[in-house]
Design a protein with these regions (language model features):
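Intrinsic N-terminal pre-sequences and regulatory tails
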Residues: 1-10, 117-132
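A low-complexity, Ser/Thr/Gly/Pro-enriched, surface-exposed linker/loop concept
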Residues: 2, 39-69, 109, 113-122
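Short, amphipathic, aromatic/basic-enriched membrane-interface segments that mark the entry/exit
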Residues: 3-15, 64-71
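Membrane-helix boundary elements
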Residues: 16-37
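Hydrophobic alpha-helical membrane segments
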Residues: 69-84
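Membrane-helix boundary connector in multi-pass membrane proteins
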Residues: 82-99
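Alpha-helical membrane-associated segments of multi-pass integral membrane proteins
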Residues: 95-115
Length: 132
């Protein structure tokens, strides 16, 4: 479900991989408690795996419908925002807490403006612009 369909699938895919990688890298680089690092590594890894399985421009296996993928986006956003408070590291890992909240809000924002009605025959992508 999106509010407006501004963002094409290929750009959403780029954002997915960027978020997944940045969650892992920032969590490991920043350090902190096991719980604080685990949130970034686990959510980041799941984002990457779901992205690779999704039927969209940068999907690898392309077995998961993009509309189903959207549910994972909303779940990831919620987990990123609430996990510092639920797992109790918001007072000790303030940098990671802020990063997770910002990342969660960004994931939510991207999800709300994505066109989840992806059709690979009609979708513009950078590679099609080169060959056209």
């Amino acid at each position: 479900m999106s509010l407006v369909r501004l963002l094409p699938a290929w750009l959403h895919a780029v954002a997915d991989y960027a978020v997944g990688l940045s969650l892992i890298v920032v969590a490991v680089a920043a350090g902190g408690s096991t719980k604080a690092v685990a949130v970034g590594v686990v959510v980041g890894a799941v984002v990457l795996i779901v992205s690779m399985l999704t039927k969209y421009p940068l999907g690898v296996a392309k077995v998961l419908p993009f509309t189903v993928h959207s549910a994972g986006d909303y779940l990831a956003a919620a987990l990123l925002v609430v996990s510092p408070f639920v797992l109790g590291f918001h007072n000790t890992a303030t940098g990671l807490t802020a990063f997770y909240i910002v990342a969660g809000v960004a994931v939510l924002a991207v999800s709300l403006i994505t066109n989840y009605q992806y059709n690979d025959k009609r979708e513009w992508s950078p590679s099609r612009a080169v060959t056209a």
